Amino acid sequence: MSAFGHDEAWMEAGGFGLEAAERTEYQSLCKSKLLFLGEQSVGKTSIISRFMYNSFGCACQATVGIDFLSKTMYLEDQIVQLQLWDTAGQERFHSLIPSYIRDSTIAVVVYDITNINSFKETDKWVEHVRAERGDDVVIMLLGNKIDLDNKRQVTAEQGEEKSRNLNVMFIETSAKTGYNVKKLFRRVASALLSTRTSPPPKEGTVEIELESFEESGNRSYC
């Protein structure tokens, strides 16, 4: 059984102040895909769990096989269906990742602010994305676990500087407290919308997909 259970679709309109009658007038987008990348234990799965279920756990049953999660939200005048792909950080799974990058539209590269090595490895992940997708992708550099600020090894200024050098977006979050998690998804969805240079088909949707490949055994979300 997976960490997430089964596929779920969520409709979230309250945060955007929409009435039911207004939703019928909204346009939708073509398919896309959001991919989470980063080293093991940086909190990729925890961020997804916080966004999908508003929950956090330091230990849960390991994911076996593939999970698919989706969440539909309303942003500006568009319906955005987020389908999230979660990749395992273990070295044994790294050879699988390029095939999942190839059709991605958004890549979120995650590091742990209490682990300087995970921060150093973000260059590698961004290089992988650009090698497969060039400039046809939105990239967000994400520093997670800011609830552990007293153990911080990477400053926000260092994260911002690296994001400028790599020409990517930047944000810090806490999957544990939920700080900035919704903002993360709003920002990447907005960035995706801004890359659309022509009006999307009325019947389409933005789809950003999630698959997770995790090593068997106990793991930590923290």
Swiss-Prot record:
A lipid is attached at residue 222 (S-geranylgeranyl cysteine). The keyword Ribosomal protein does not apply. Mg(2+) binds at residues 45, 63, 86. It is found in: Cytoplasm. Residues 89-105 are annotated as: Switch-II. GO terms for molecular function: GTP binding; GTPase activity. CDD domains: Rab6 (cd01861). Widely expressed in brain, testis, lung, heart, ovary, colon, kidney, uterus and spleen but not in liver. The keyword Hydrolase applies. The small GTPases Rab are key regulators of intracellular membrane trafficking, from the formation of transport vesicles to their fusion with membranes. Rabs cycle between an inactive GDP-bound form and an active GTP-bound form that is able to recruit to membranes different sets of downstream effectors directly responsible for vesicle formation, movement, tethering and fusion. RAB41 is required for normal Golgi ribbon organization and ER-to-Golgi trafficking. Belongs to the small GTPase superfamily. Rab family. This is Ras-related protein Rab-41. It comes from Homo sapiens.
